[in-house]
């Protein structure tokens, strides 16, 4: 009885072990692949619990979501013969679920070692071998990430379609200590040079600002001088116009005065012409004789007041008798 119980217990244990090995779980973001007798089965499974033949069938879970593969301590020799080391290179990639079977069949479940790790070593050494230390360490370092990504993706598209490289991140390489110190010194000198260049630019900018300020001041002075000159010109033109107006007014006054004098003389001449009558001439004659202060003697004195036709001979006779009259007075 005890023997039968032991057999039954053993059977239960075997059945439990078989069930335990037959039931397996696939995590979300993974694809299950199966091996039977070392041969890869075409059957794949998604996330969840699944059954398989116990003991003779095994499975592996292959990640199909984004994953980061790290390649560490990659040696690299430059074209100048300097050996440098990249501490860590990160490759962000993912595997398309439909391509899991083909990838695992051709490159096993550890496909990343053959397709990514080895390819990173190869591409980095190819890159370093055609560039010197200055280019790898400084000038072209920012291009290494993109160059590695493109080279990896190009080869994977040919060898293993279904693996997508999203990004590659490369850390700064380690270089020999002596060279590193030289680069640090060079960077320090470059920084000093940049600072000096910036200071020079600041000085040039200040000088340019001062020059522009001086130009503005000079233009302001020139504009003020031009305005003052314009004002003086306007004042002179105003004075000239005032002088012209005064000259014109003076000329007009003089012309008016001359015209008035001419008119007065003309009218006086016309009046005199009208006055030249025999009676007026006789009156003037008498006035002239009356105004004469000399005293005439002789018999012709009364005749001086006769008419003008006999005045001439009488006057001549009076002049002839004037010396005799003067003698008598003595």
Curated annotation (Swiss-Prot):
Location of the protein in the cell: Endoplasmic reticulum membrane
| Entry protein name | Erlin-2-B
Spell out where the chain crosses the membrane: 3-23
Keywords for this entry? Answer: Cholesterol metabolism, Endoplasmic reticulum, Glycoprotein, Lipid metabolism, Membrane, Signal-anchor, Steroid metabolism, Sterol metabolism, Transmembrane, Transmembrane helix
| Membrane topology, as annotated | Single-pass type II membrane protein
Key word Lipid metabolism present? yes
Q: Can you tell me which family this protein belongs to?
A: Belongs to the band 7/mec-2 family.
Write out the GO cellular component annotations.
endoplasmic reticulum membrane
Lumenal compartment segments: 24-330
Positions of region (Disordered): 308-330
Topology, Cytoplasmic side: 1-2
SMART domains linked: PHB
Entry superkingdom: Eukaryota
Q: Which InterPro entries match?
A: Band_7, Band_7/SPFH_dom_sf, Erlin1/2
- Set out the biological process GO terms recorded for this chain's protein: cholesterol metabolic process; SREBP signaling pathway
Q: Which Pfam families match?
A: Band_7 (PF01145)
Recorded hits in CDD domains, A to Z, give: SPFH_like_u3
Residues modified by carbohydrate are 106
Q: Could you tell me which species this protein originates from?
A: Xenopus laevis (African clawed frog)
- Answer whether the UniProt record assigns the keyword Lipid metabolism to this protein: yes
Lineage at the top is: Eukaryota, Metazoa, Chordata, Craniata, Vertebrata
Q: What is its main location?
A: endoplasmic reticulum
A single MF term (Gene Ontology): ubiquitin protein ligase binding
């Amino acid at each position: 009885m005890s023997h039968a119980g032991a057999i039954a217990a053993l059977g239960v244990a075997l059945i439990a072990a078989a069930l335990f090995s037959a039931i397996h779980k696939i995590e979300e973001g993974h694809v299950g692949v199966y091996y039977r007798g070392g041969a890869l089965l075409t059957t794949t499974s998604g996330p969840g619990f699944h059954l398989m033949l116990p003991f003779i069938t095994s499975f592996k879970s292959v990640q199909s979501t984004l994953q980061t593969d790290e390649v560490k301590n990659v040696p690299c020799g430059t074209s100048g013969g300097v050996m440098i080391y990249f501490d860590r290179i990160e490759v962000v990639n993912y595997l398309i679920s439909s391509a899991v079977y083909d990838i695992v069949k051709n490159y096993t479940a550890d496909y990343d070692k053959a397709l990514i790790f080895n390819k990173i070593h190869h591409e980095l050494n190819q890159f370093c071998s055609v560039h010197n230390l200055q280019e790898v360490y400084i000038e072209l370092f920012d291009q290494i990430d993109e160059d590695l990504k493109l080279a990896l993706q190009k080869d994977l598209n040919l060898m293993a379609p279904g693996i997508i490289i999203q990004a590659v991140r490369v850390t700064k390489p380690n270089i020999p200590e002596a060279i590193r110190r030289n680069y640090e010194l060079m960077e320090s000198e470059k920084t000093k040079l940049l600072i000096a260049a910036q200071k020079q630019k600041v000085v040039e900018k200040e000088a340019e600002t001062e020059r522009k300020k001086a130009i503005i001041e000079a233009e302001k002075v020139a504009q003020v001088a031009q305005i003052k000159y314009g004002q003086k010109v306007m004042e002179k033109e105003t004075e000239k116009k005032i002088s012209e107006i005064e000259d014109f007014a003076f000329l007009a006054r003089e012309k008016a005065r001359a015209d008035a004098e001419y008119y007065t003389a003309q009218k006086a001449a016309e009046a005199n012409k009208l006055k030249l009558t025999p009676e007026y001439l006789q009156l003037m004659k008498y006035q002239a004789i009356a105004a004469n202060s000399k005293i005439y003697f002789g018999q012709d004195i009364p005749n001086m007041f006769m008419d003008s036709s006999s005045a001439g001979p009488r006057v001549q006779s009076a002049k002839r008798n004037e010396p005799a009259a003067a003698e008598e007075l003595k």
